Swiss-Prot record:
Protein name: Fluoride-specific ion channel FluC
Signal peptide: none
Family membership: Belongs to the fluoride channel Fluc/FEX (TC 1.A.43) family.
Originating organism: Neisseria meningitidis serogroup A / serotype 4A (strain DSM 15465 / Z2491)
Single Gene Ontology MF annotation: fluoride channel activity
């Protein structure tokens, strides 16, 4: 059990830190939602690669469950979308939904293709 908790925890700490740093790196002139969009797109792309290339169970725990689970954020996406709706910005809310969903699906597919190619 501990042999699973350690890699999971390390990955989660690294993923949360990466998301925080990514949000800090987004220029203030962009929407606050941009950092989470980039985090979700990055996670979608990497999960495709890792799903095809990582076989060891503890590395999967570290990279997929821990790191990518903390890097990506459905709750942040949900809050941003609802906030846009509450601010009477339905077009921005719909754009946010589309960009997160379509972008993540496309990047996961691309990551799977790349992961298969390098396997």
């Amino acid at each position: 059990m501990l042999s699973n908790i350690i890699p999971l925890s390390i990955g989660a700490a690294l993923g949360a830190t990466a998301r925080w740093l990514l949000n800090l790196a987004v220029p203030a002139s962009l929407s606050p939602a941009t950092g989470n969009l980039f985090a979700n797109w990055t996670g979608a792309f990497l999960i495709g690669i890792f799903a095809e290339t990582v076989n060891h169970p503890q590395w999967k725990l570290l990279l997929i469950t821990g790191f990518l689970g903390s890097l990506t954020t459905l709750s942040g996406f949900s809050l941003e979308t609802v906030t846009l709706l509450q601010s009477n910005r339905p077009a921005s809310a719909l754009a946010n939904i589309f960009l997160h969903t379509a972008g993540s699906l496309l990047l996961t597919w691309l990551g799977l293709k790349i992961g298969t190619a390098v396997k």
